Swiss-Prot record:
Keywords: Phosphoprotein, Repeat, WD repeat
WD repeats: 17-56, 62-104, 156-199, 324-366, 404-443, 462-507, 558-597, 1349-1388, 1390-1430
Biased composition (Basic and acidic residues): 768-781
GO terms for biological process, alphabetical: hematopoietic progenitor cell differentiation
PANTHER family from the UniProt entry: RABCONNECTIN-3B, ISOFORM A, WD REPEAT-CONTAINING PROTEIN 7
Gene3D superfamilies: YVTN repeat-like/Quinoprotein amine dehydrogenase
Name of a matching Pfam family: WDR72_alpha-sol
SUPFAM superfamilies: Quinoprotein alcohol dehydrogenase-like (SSF50998), WD40 repeat-like (SSF50978)
Protein name: WD repeat-containing protein 7
GO cellular component entries: cytoplasm; synaptic vesicle
Organism: Rattus norvegicus (Rat)
C-alpha cells in the first residue's frame, strides 16, 4: 500500500495518551532525540532540547511484539538511523528524523542486545550490527540491508550471550568483541576490517575463552575514558576487570538486598550502578582500578571481600517513586563531540521519562544527598498540557454531564460504501456518524462549532456495558445482507443491528465471557456456515452464529487456555482453534463435535496446513498492531470488495446515461479515498482513529464525478419540462416514465433530508414507527437511492475539503488565506494536525499532538498572549518544517489535488449543508444537481505534460458551453475565480514556500522521493512530482545540483557498453543480459513486497545488471539504483544541454548552468556521466521484457520519458536507430490503447507506456529533426531492400516499422507543422518515409492531397493523379519522381541550387521545375506513350529537358526562415502555359 499510492494518515488521538510501557531506551548521537521502545511494540521518539526539555514527537508502528533492544545504526552526522528488534525476531531500520522505516526483516531468533560497529574499507565507511540474544552466537548484520553476513561462534562451551561490548583499538587495525555468556564465561573475538568486508564467510571462532564466575550478568561496559577497564554488573554484585588480561580489580555487593540491573562508567574513576526498582548509585573507584595511578593493579589476586569501594552518591530518592507494573529501564549516555551532557535516562511502565544530568560531581558533596531529576515527563503529561486537548473522533457527541472526560470509544468499524463510522462506547451505546463530518468538527474551525450534536448521527442502545468489538460483514463479503451490523460486548452478548432503521434484530447470549473478537468465515465454507459470523469470548469459547437462522449453530467451548488464533479448513468442514499454551483443537463445524486435540509440532503443522488451504484468512487475535499491519497490507483486497458506490450511481446520472451503452461501462475504481482505521496500542486503551487519505483515489473520484456529471438542470418540475425539450444532450431521455421515476427520487432525497434534520438527537416514537413501515415495504426500500444518507452531502468533495484544509500552509500568505476561506470554502484547523507517514510494509509513524511545541518557551508565551483570538499562530506552518519526507508527501498531495480541482468546473467547497437558506447554490455533485453543468474537460487537458498553471483555457471552454444562456456570466466569473484560487494555491506550494517560511525552517522535499514518482501512474501526481522536482533542482542552483550528482553517481549501475543495435537478434539480447534467477534473498524480497503493486519504481530490479559493486539484493539498494538513473537523467535532460535547443523545446539555457559531466564539448570535461546515464536509460528501454523488468514497468516508462526530454544530451552516446525503433515498437498500438481510456481513471500500464513513447518521439523529432528523419529513412530503405530480397530472413525491425506507420506519419506531420525548414532540407527522405507509410492503393484512390495533406503545402511537391506520380524537389538541385504503381523512384538532375517549386502540367506531359538560387526554370517532357504508361518491361519513364529559361531571382520578404520556403510557386493555366508567381505577387509567364 505504501509502495506506490500516495497515502497520508491523519490521527485523532483522543485525550488519553496511548499506553507506553517502556522496555528499552536510546539517545541518538546528536543528543537531540530519545528513542524508547515499549512492551506493546511501538517506538516513541522524544525531542530533547539543549535545556534538557523533553517533548514527545512521534509514535512508530510496525513491530508486532515487545521491543527487546534499540541501537544506533549509522555514524554519519546527517543521517540518524536507529535499528529496533522485537521479541518475535523482527528487525526494523528507522530514520529517526521522520519516522520512516527504511528496511525491515524477520529472523527466527530473538535479539536481546545490538551494538553498532563501524569500520573503513578504503575510503568507504561501512556499518555492522552485532546482535546477541536467545541463541548461542553473535550474528553480524549489515547495517543498511539488515542481511546476516556471518557469525561469531564459540568452540568451547557455546551458550547464550548475556552481554557484549566492542573494544576499539586505536593502535592496531584489530577490534575486540568481548562477551559474557549466561554461564559466566568470558569470550573474546578479534574482528579485522578484512573480515568485516567479506560476506557469507565461514563463522569466526573465539580467540580466548575464560570463566570469570559472574552469574546472571546484566551488563558489560568498556571504559571509554581509560580504555583499560571493564565493568560487569550481575544481579547481586558488580565488578571491575582489567581489559588487558581480564583480572579482577574491584567488586561491590548489592545495597540492602536489591537487584542490580546495569551500570556504566561516568568518568575514569566513577561508576554508576542502578537497581531494578529504579534507584541509582554512583561509586568512586579505588586507586588500584585507575591506570593513571601508581597503585594500579595493586589489588590483583586479593580476596573479593577486601575490594569494596565506598558509595559516593545516591542518585534517586525513594520517596518520589510512583507504583509501576514492571521494573523501569535505566541507561546512561554521555555525549559525543558537540554534545557534552552526561545523562542518566529512566523510563517506566507509565510512559514516563526521567532524566538526571550528572555533571562531574564534586567530591565535597555529602554521600546521603540525593540528586534531583532534571526533567520528568510522561506521554499523558504531554497530552494534558495541550490547549485545546487532543481531540477524539466523536468527542463532541460523547460528553458526560459533570465530567470533563468524554466517553471512551472502545470499538470502531468504518463503512466506506456509505462514508460512515460506527463507534461502540464504554457505556454500551453505538453511534453511527458520517466520518468526514465528524473529523471536520474535531480538526477545523467553522459554523459547526456552534451546533450541539453536529453532525446528525444515529445512536443504537442495547448493550449493558462496554462494547468490545464491531463487525460489518457485508464489507468483508458481499454474501451478507448490507443492513446487518454485528456488535459484541462485555455483557457476554452479540447483537445484530439493522443500520438503516437502527433497530435491534436479534441478541445472542451463548457465551460465558466478554466477546473478544468477531470474524467472518471464508468464502468456500458450507452454505449454512457462510451466513454465520464467528464469535470468540474470554471464557475460551468460539461460537458460529447464524444471521439467517438467528441462532447459534455451533459452540466450541471447553478450551483450557485463552484462544489465540482461529483458522479454517473449509474443504474438511473443520474449525481449528489455537490456544495460548500451544495446543490446537479441531472442531467439526456442522456437527459441533471435537475432532481431535494436538500439542507440540503436530499442532504447528495443523495450523500451517490451514494456512495453505485459506491463505487470506489469517486472523491473529493476540495483538492490535498485528491487525493494523494486516489491514494495511491487505487493504487493497478489502477495498476491492467494499468498493464504494460512486456518486455516479445516484439520482439523475443513471437515468440520463443512455441505458444500454453507458450503464455497464461506468467505471468502478477499487480504492476508497478515505479509510478510517481504529488502532489500540494496548488492549486496555480506547481507540485511536487514523484517517488514511488515498490521494490517487481521491483524484480519480473527483475526475470520475466531474466526467459523469450530466448536463441537465434538475431544480424544479418546470426545469424538468424545459430540459426535456432543450437541445441539451441527455434531455431527450427524460420522457414520461423516466421523468416520473426521477421525481420520485428527488422527492425521496428531500424527504430523507428533512427527516434526518429532525433526527438530530434521539428519534421520536412515530418517526421510528414510520421507518419500520418503510422497512417492511421492500419495494419502497428498493426505490431508495441511498438508504444510509443521514444528511445530504458529497463524500468526495467533503473528503477533499477536510484534506486540503489540513494540508494548506496557513498563515504564510494572508491574501491567499482569505481566498481559501471565502472563495474555495476551506476551513482553518483548530490546532496543529497530527499527520503520519507511511513507509514500506505497512510501517508507519504518527505524529503525537503538540509535536511542534519543542521550539521552546517562545511559542508558549506567544500562545498565552494571543489566547483571546484563535490560536492559529503556529498551526499551518507545522508540517513543512517537520522533515523532508513529510514535506515531500504533503506538497505532492496538495499540488496534485489543487491541479485536479482546478481542472474541474467550479470546484469550491462553499455551499455547505449548514446553510439551509432556500436560495443556496447546491454543492457541485450533490444529488440535486441544480446547476447546469459544463461538459467534462477535453481529455487532452488531462494529457498535457506540464503543470496546469493557468485557469484561462478552462473558462474559455465553459464560455463556449454557456453561449446560449444570458445568466451564465456571473456563474462563469465565479468559476474562473475558483480556478484562479486553486492555481494560486498550487503555485504557492510549488515554488514560494522556501521564501515564505525561510530557509532555516523549511525542510525541502526529498529529491529521491520525487524522482520515484517522476512517472507515477496517476497523471496528476506525476505532474506535481515533475513540477516539484524541477522547481527544487532550480532552487538549489548549480552547486546543489553538483552535490546531488556526486551523491547519486556511485549508485548508477554500470551497463555493458555495447547497446543493442538493430543487427542484433532477440536471442542475443536475451543472453547478453541474462538475469540471475530470483532465488534466495531476491525471492524473499519479492514475496514481502506483496504490498507494492508492479508499479513501484524498483520493479526494474536492476540488480540483474553486471556492476562494479557487489551484487546487493537489498530492496534499498535496488531502489537507490533506480533513483540514481532517474535523478541523473532529469538533471542531464533539463540542465545538461550545452547546445541551444530549438526555441520550441524549452527556454534557452546559458552554458554556465551545465552540471559537470553533462556538457558536450566543455574542454576535456568528464562527460562519462552523461554516457553512463544514457547507457542506463537505453538499456531500460531496449531490455526485452522479463519477470524482473516487465514490459510496462514504471522505470521503463521513466527511461522513455527522460530519453525524450534530454535527447540532445544523450544523442552522442546512443544508437539512435535502436532507440527510435524501441519507441516505435511501444507506440505502434497507441491509437488502440489510448482510445479506450476512461476519463479520470489512471491509464493502464500499456497505454501509459504508449503515451510516454509517443511524447518522447515527438520531443526527439522536434529537438533533432535531421537525426529523426535520416534514421527512419535508413530503416525504411533497409526494410524495402529486405522485402525485395524475399529469401533473406525477416529482420527484427520489420514488424515494428510496419506496425508503427501511423505513428511515423503523426510525427512527420508535427515536423512539417513546427519545423518546415528542417523537413525541406531532407524532403526526399521525408517523401521516402511517407511513401512507405501510406498505402499505395489508398493514394491511387484518393490522391495525395487527401491522404497526407500536410506535405502538399510545400511548393516543391507536386502530384499528378492520372499517372499517379509525385515529383519532389530536393535541396541539392535534383528532382525525385515517384511512381506509386510500381513503387519505384527516379532522380533527375537539372539545377545547381535548391528547388523552389515543381508542378505537373494538367495533362501530365510536362513537369516544370524552378530553382531560385540558379534562377532557372526548366521544363521536362514526360514520356506518356501507351507503352510507357503501362510501364512495359518495368522500364522507367523517359524524361528529357526540353526548355530552360532564365528568371530574375526573387528576393525574400524578410530574412525569416519560413519565407524562404514560399518564395514562388508554379501555376499551370493550360496544358502549355505556366505562371511563376512570386510571393510578392509578381508573375512571369512561360510557354512550353
Amino acid at each position: 500500500m505504501a509502495g506506490n499510492s500516495l497515502v497520508l494518515p491523519i490521527v485523532l488521538w483522543g485525550r488519553k495518551a496511548p499506553t507506553h510501557c517502556i522496555s528499552s531506551i536510546l539517545l541518538t548521537d546528536d543528543g537531540g532525540t530519545i528513542v524508547t521502545g515499549c512492551h506493546d511494540g511501538q517506538i516513541c521518539l522524544w525531542d530533547l532540547s539543549e535545556e534538557l526539555e523533553v517533548n514527545p514527537r512521534a509514535l512508530l508502528f510496525g513491530h508486532t511484539a515487545a521491543i527487546t533492544c534499540l541501537s544506533k545504526a549509522c555514524a554519519s552526522g546527517d543521517k540518524q538511523y536507529t535499528v529496533s528488534a522485537s521479541a518475535n525476531g523482527e528487525m526494523c531500520l528507522w530514520d529517526v528524523n521522520d519516522g520512516r522505516c527504511i528496511e525491515f526483516t524477520k529472523l527466527a531468533c530473538t535479539h536481546t542486545g545490538i551494538q553498532f560497529y563501524q569500520f573503513s574499507v578504503g575510503n568507504q565507511r561501512e556499518g555492522r550490527l552485532l546482535c546477541h540474544g536467545h541463541y548461542p552466537e553473535i550474528l553480524v548484520v549489515d547495517a543498511t540491508s539488515l542481511e546476516v553476513l556471518y557469525s561469531l561462534v564459540s568452540k568451547i562451551s557455546p551458550d547464550w550471550i548475556s552481554s557484549m561490548s566492542i573494544i576499539r583499538s586505536h593502535r592496531t587495525q584489530e577490534d575486540t568483541v568481548v562477551a559474557l555468556s549466561v554461564t559466566g564465561i568470558l569470550k573474546v573475538w578479534i574482528v579485522t576490517s578484512e573480515i568485516s568486508g567479506l560476506q557469507d564467510t565461514e563463522p569466526i571462532f573465539e580467540e580466548e575463552s575464560k570463566p570469570i564466575y559472574c552469574q546472571n550478568c546484566q551488563s558489560l561496559s568498556f571504559c571509554a575514558f581509560t580504555q583499560r577497564s571493564l565493568l560487569v554488573v550481575c544481579s547481586k554484585y558488580w565488578r571491575v576487570f582489567d581489559a588487558g588480561d581480564y583480572s579482577l580489580l574491584c567488586s561491590g555487593p548489592s545495597e540492602d538486598g536489591q537487584t542490580w540491573t546495569g551500570g556504566d562508567f561516568v568518568s575514569a574513576d566513577k561508576v554508576i550502578i542502578w537497581t531494578e526498582n529504579g534507584q541509582s548509585y554512583i561509586y568512586k573507584l579505588p586507586a588500584s582500578c585507575l591506570p593513571a595511578s601508581d597503585s594500579f593493579r595493586s589489588d590483583v589476586g586479593k580476596a573479593v571481600e577486601n575490594l569494596i569501594p565506598p558509595v559516593q552518591h545516591s542518585l534517586l530518592d525513594q520517596k518520589d517513586r510512583e507504583l509501576v507494573i514492571c521494573p523501569p529501564v535505566t541507561r546512561f549516555f554521555y555525549g559525543c563531540k558537540e554534545y557534552l551532557h552526561k545523562l542518566l535516562i529512566q523510563g517506566d511502565s507509565s510512559g514516563r521519562l526521567s532524566i538526571w544530568n550528572i555533571a562531574d560531581i564534586a567530591d565535597k558533596q555529602e554521600a546521603n544527598e540525593g540528586l534531583k531529576t532534571t526533567t520528568c515527563i510522561s506521554l499523558q503529561d504531554a497530552f494534558d498540557k495541550l490547549k485545546p486537548c487532543p481531540a477524539g473522533i466523536i468527542d463532541q457527541l460523547s460528553v458526560i454531564p459533570n465530567s470533563n472526560e468524554p466517553l471512551k470509544v472502545t470499538a470502531s468499524v468504518y463503512i466506506p460504501a456509505h462514508g460512515r463510522l460506527v463507534c461502540g462506547r464504554e457505556d454500551g451505546s453505538i453511534i453511527i456518524v458520517p466520518a468526514t463530518q465528524t473529523a471536520i468538527v474535531q480538526l477545523l474551525q467553522g459554523e459547526h462549532m456552534l451546533r450541539r450534536g453536529w453532525p446528525p448521527h444515529r445512536t443504537l442502545r442495547g448493550h449493558r456495558n462496554k462494547v468490545t468489538c464491531l463487525l460489518y460483514p457485508h464489507q468483508v463479503s458481499a454474501r451478507y445482507d448490507q443492513r446487518y451490523l454485528i456488535s459484541g460486548g462485555v455483557d457476554f452478548s452479540v447483537i445484530i443491528w439493522d443500520i438503516f432503521s437502527g433497530e435491534m434484530k436479534h441478541i445472542f447470549c451463548v457465551h460465558g465471557g466478554e466477546i473478544t473478537q468477531l470474524l467472518v468465515p471464508p468464502e468456500n465454507c458450507s452454505a449454512r456456515v457462510q451466513h454465520c459470523v464467528c464469535s470468540v469470548a474470554s471464557d475460551h469459547s468460539v461460537g458460529l452464529l447464524s444471521l439467517r437462522e438467528k441462532k447459534c449453530i455451533m459452540l466450541a467451548s471447553r478450551h483450557l487456555f485463552p484462544i489465540q488464533v482461529i483458522k479454517w479448513r473449509p474443504s474438511d468442514d473443520y474449525l481449528v482453534v489455537g490456544c495460548t499454551d500451544g495446543s490446537v483443537c479441531v472442531w467439526q463445524m456442522d456437527t459441533g463435535a471435537l475432532d481431535r486435540c494436538a500439542m507440540g509440532i503436530t499442532a504447528v503443522e495443523i495450523l500451517n496446513a490451514c494456512d495453505e488451504a485459506v491463505p487470506a484468512a489469517v486472523d491473529s487475535l493476540s495483538h492490535p498492531a498485528v491487525n493494523l499491519k494486516q489491514a494495511m497490507t491487505r487493504r487493497s483486497l478489502a477495498a476491492l470488495k467494499n468498493m464504494a458506490h460512486h456518486k455516479l450511481q445516484t439520482l439523475a446520472t443513471n437515468l440520463l446515461a443512455s441505458e444500454a451503452s453507458d450503464k455497464g461501462n461506468l467505471p468502478k475504481y477499487s480504492h476508497n479515498s478515505l479509510m478510517v482505521q481504529a488502532i489500540k496500542t494496548n488492549l486496555t486503551d480506547p481507540d485511536i482513529h487514523v484517517l488514511f487519505f488515498d490521494v490517487e483515489a481521491l483524484i480519480i473520484q473527483l475526475l470520475t464525478e466531474e466526467a459523469s456529471r450530466p448536463n441537465t438542470a434538475l431544480i424544479s418540475p418546470e426545469n424538468l419540462q424545459k430540459a426535456s425539450g432543450s437541445s441539451d444532450k441527455g434531455g431527450s431521455f427524460l420522457t414520461g416514465k423516466r421523468a416520473a421515476v426521477l421525481f420520485q427520487q428527488v422527492k425521496e432525497t428531500i424527504k430523507e433530508n428533512i427527516k434526518e434534520h429532525l433526527l438530530d438527537e434521539e428519534e421520536d416514537e412515530e418517526e421510528v414507527m414510520r421507518q419500520r413501515r418503510e422497512e417492511s415495504d421492500p419495494e419502497y426500500r428498493a426505490s431508495k437511492s441511498k438508504p444510509l444518507t443521514l444528511l445530504e452531502y458529497n463524500l468526495t468533495m467533503d473528503t477533499a475539503k477536510l484534506f486540503m484544509s489540513c494540508l494548506h500552509a496557513w498563515g504564510l500568505n494572508e491574501v491567499l488565506d482569505e481566498v481559501c476561506l471565502d472563495r474555495l470554502g476551506m476551513l482553518k484547523p483548530h490546532c496543529t494536525v497530527s499527520f503520519g507517514l507511511l513507509s514500506r510494509g505497512g510501517h508507519m509513524s504518527l505524529m503525537l499532538p503538540g509535536y511542534n511545541q519543542a521550539a521552546g518557551k517562545l511559542l508558549q508565551a506567544k500562545a498565552e498572549a494571543g489566547r483571546k483570538g484563535p490560536a492559529t499562530e503556529s498551526v499551518g506552518k507545522g508540517t513543512y518544517t517537520v522533515s523532508r519526507a513529510v514535506t515531500t508527501q504533503h506538497l505532492l498531495s496538495i499540488i496534485s489535488l489543487a491541479n485536479t480541482l482546478m481542472s474541474m468546473t467550479n470546484a469550491t467547497f462553499i455551499g455547505d449543508h449548514m446553510k439551509k437558506g432556500p436560495t443556496r447554490p447546491p454543492r457541485p455533485g450533490t444529488p440535486d444537481l441544480s446547476k447546469a453543468r459544463d461538459s467534462p474537460p477535453a481529455s487532452s487537458n488531462i494529457v498535457q505534460g506540464q503543470i496546469k498553471q493557468a485557469a484561462a483555457p478552462v473558462s474559455a471552454r465553459s464560455a463556449a458551453d454557456h453561449s446560449g444562456s444570458a445568466s451564465a456570466s456571473p456563474a462563469l466569473r465565479t468559476c474562473f475565480l475558483v480556478n484562479e484560487g486553486w492555481s494560486q494555491l498550487a503555485a504557492m506550494h510549488c515554488v514560494m514556500l522556501p521564501d515564505l517560511l525561510g530557509l532555516g525552517k523549511f525542510r525541502p522535499p526529498l529529491l529521491e522521493m520525487l524522482a520515484r514518482r517522476w512517472q507515477d501512474r496517476c497523471l496528476e501526481v506525476r505532474e506535481a512530482a515533475q513540477a516539484l522536482l524541477l522547481a527544487e533542482l532550480r532552487r538549489i542552483e548549480q552547486a546543489g545540483r553538483k552535490e546531488t550528482i556526486d551523491t547519486w553517481a556511485p549508485y548508477l549501475p554500470q551497463y555493458m557498453d555495447h547497446v543493442i543495435s538493430p543487427g542484433v537478434t532477440a536471442e542475443a539480447m536475451q543472453t547478453m543480459a541474462a538475469a540471475p534467477d530470483a532465488s534466495g534473498p531476491e525471492a524473499k524480497v519479492q514475496e514481502e513486497e506483496h504490498d507494492l503493486v508492479d508499479d513501484d519504481i524498483t520493479t526494474g530490479c536492476l540488480s540483474s545488471v553486471p556492476q562494479m559493486k557487489k551484487m546487493s539484493t537489498s530492496y534499498e539498494e535496488r531502489r537507490k539504483q533506480a533513483t540514481a538513473i532517474v535523478l541523473l537523467g532529469v538533471i542531464g535532460a533539463e540542465f545538461g544541454a550545452e547546445i541551444e535547443p530549438p526555441k520550441l523545446l524549452t527556454r534557452p539555457r546559458s552554458s554556465s548552468q551545465i552540471p559537470e559531466g553533462f556538457g558536450l564539448t566543455s574542454g576535456g570535461s568528464n562527460y562519462s556521466l552523461a554516457r553512463h546515464t544514457c547507457k542506463a536509460l537505453t538499456f531500460l528501454l531496449l531490455q526485452p521484457p522479463s519477470p524482473k523488468l516487465p514490459p510496462h514497468s514504471t522505470i521503463r516508462r521513466t527511461a522513455i520519458d527522460l530519453i525524450g526530454r534530454g535527447f540532445t544530451v544523450w544523442e552522442p552516446y546512443m544508437d539512435v536507430s535502436a532507440v527510435l525503433m524501441g519507441l516505435l515498437e511501444l507506440c505502434a498500438d497507441a491509437e488502440k490503447q489510448l482510445a479506450n481510456i476512461t476519463m479520470g481513471l489512471p491509464l493502464s500500464p500499456a497505454a501509459d507506456s504508449a503515451r510516454s513513447a509517443r511524447h518522447a518521439l515527438s520531443l526527439i523529432a522536434t529537438a533533432r529533426p535531421p537525426a529523426f528523419i535520416t534514421t527512419i529513412a535508413k530503416e525504411v530503405h533497409r526494410h524495402t531492400a529486405l522485402a525485395a530480397n524475399t529469401q533473406s530472413q525477416q529482420s527484427i525491425h520489420t514488424t515494428t516499422l510496419a506496425r508503427a506507420k501511423g505513428e511515423i506519419l503523426r510525427v512527420i506531420e508535427i515536423l512539417i507543422e513546427k519545423m518546415p525548414t528542417d523537413v525541406v532540407d531532407l524532403l526526399v527522405e521525408v517523401m521516402d518515409i511517407i511513401m512507405y507509410c501510406l498505402e499505395g492503393s489508398l493514394v491511387k484512390k484518393k490522391g495525395l492531397q487527401e491522404c497526407f495533406p500536410a506535405i502538399c503545402r510545400f511548393y516543391m511537391v507536386s502530384y499528378y493523379e492520372r499517372s499517379h506520380r509525385i515529383a519532389v524537389g530536393a535541396r541539392h538541385g535534383s528532382v525525385a519522381l515517384y511512381d506509386i504503381r510500381t513503387g519505384k523512384c527516379q532522380t533527375i538532375h537539372g539545377h545547381k541550387g535548391p528547388i523552389t517549386a515543381v508542378s505537373f502540367a494538367p495533362d501530365g506531359r510536362y513537369l516544370a521545375t524552378y530553382s531560385n538560387t540558379d534562377s532557372h526554370i526548366s521544363f521536362w517532357q514526360m514520356n506518356t506513350s501507351l507503352l510507357g504508361s503501362i510501364g512495359m518491361l518495368n522500364s522507367a519513364p523517359q524524361l528529357r529537358c526540353i526548355k530552360t529559361y532564365q528568371v530574375p531571382p526573387v528576393q525574400p520578404a524578410s530574412p525569416g526562415s519560413h519565407n524562404a520556403l514560399r518564395l514562388a510557386r508554379l501555376i499551370w493555366t493550360s496544358n502549355r502555359n505556366v505562371i511563376l508567381m512570386a510571393h510578392d505577387g509578381k508573375e512571369h509567364r512561360f510557354m512550353v
